[in-house]
């Protein structure tokens, strides 16, 4: 019998469970379309069903699960359109967040946290560990959004960030993951306080990832 997942104590219990279930979905331990059985999950996380049920709405809002009276709660079955929709959303929100981040840096906001996240990502790439690289990669994007200083934008990007982590994990290869050069270029433009250049590089970064990701998933996901 496997040990219960390690959950950080400083979070609310429901959010700990949210992160735990999300991690199992992203890793594939809970496959797409599989049913979430409350009793089994409650035993695994060593909790009652109450915090488990409290975690479900956020998982559903972030696109990881779907619930219906007849089919119960199941892991979302992604389609190619879902993936393409994600990239379209990133083209709008993430590129704009990058522009705002550069503008705030130009006004004197610190880029130290983003620099640290970028260095951690650059250290992760040589390991070829898909989970470590996915976490580090998304952390860079999260720090850019945080630096943008817009709480509503940050909330909107939260769901995108989680689903991006899921898709990144599904399609990971060292070749697709790259070396993080574009992240470094984005960072330099932000640090130099150049919103136009930062947004332009961010746009190219998202576009570069779109086509190979869709191509890799074309044989495994339905179109719609």
Describe every region a protein language model picked out.
Residues 44, 173-224:
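C-terminal regulatory/effector modules of DNA-binding transcriptional regulators
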Residues 100, 143, 147, 212:
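Short alpha-helical functional segments enriched in proximate histidine and acidic residues
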Residues 1-103, 214-224:
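Short linear motifs at protein or domain termini
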């Amino acid at each position: 019998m496997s040990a219960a997942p390690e959950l950080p104590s400083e979070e609310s219990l429901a959010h700990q469970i949210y992160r735990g279930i999300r991690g199992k979905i992203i890793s594939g331990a809970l496959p797409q379309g599989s049913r979430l059985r409350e009793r089994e999950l409650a035993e695994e996380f060593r909790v009652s069903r109450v915090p488990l049920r409290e975690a479900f709405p956020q998982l559903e809002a972030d696109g990881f699960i779907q619930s219906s009276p007849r089919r119960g709660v199941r892991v979302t079955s992604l389609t190619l359109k879902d993936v393409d929709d994600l990239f379209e959303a990133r083209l709008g929100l993430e590129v704009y967040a990058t522009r705002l981040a550069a503008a705030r840096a130009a006004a004197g906001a610190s880029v130290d946290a983003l620099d640290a996240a970028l260095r951690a990502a650059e250290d992760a790439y040589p390991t070829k560990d898909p989970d470590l690289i996915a976490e580090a990669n998304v952390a860079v994007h999260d720090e850019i959004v945080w630096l943008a200083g817009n709480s509503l934008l940050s909330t909107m990007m939260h769901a995108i960030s989680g689903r991006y982590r899921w898709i990144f994990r599904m399609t990971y290869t060292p070749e697709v993951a790259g070396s993080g050069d574009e992240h470094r270029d984005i960072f330099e433009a932000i640090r130099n306080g150049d919103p136009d250049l930062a947004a332009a590089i961010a746009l190219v970064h998202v576009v570069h990832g779109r086509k190979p990701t869709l191509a890799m998933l074309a044989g495994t996901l339905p179109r719609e």
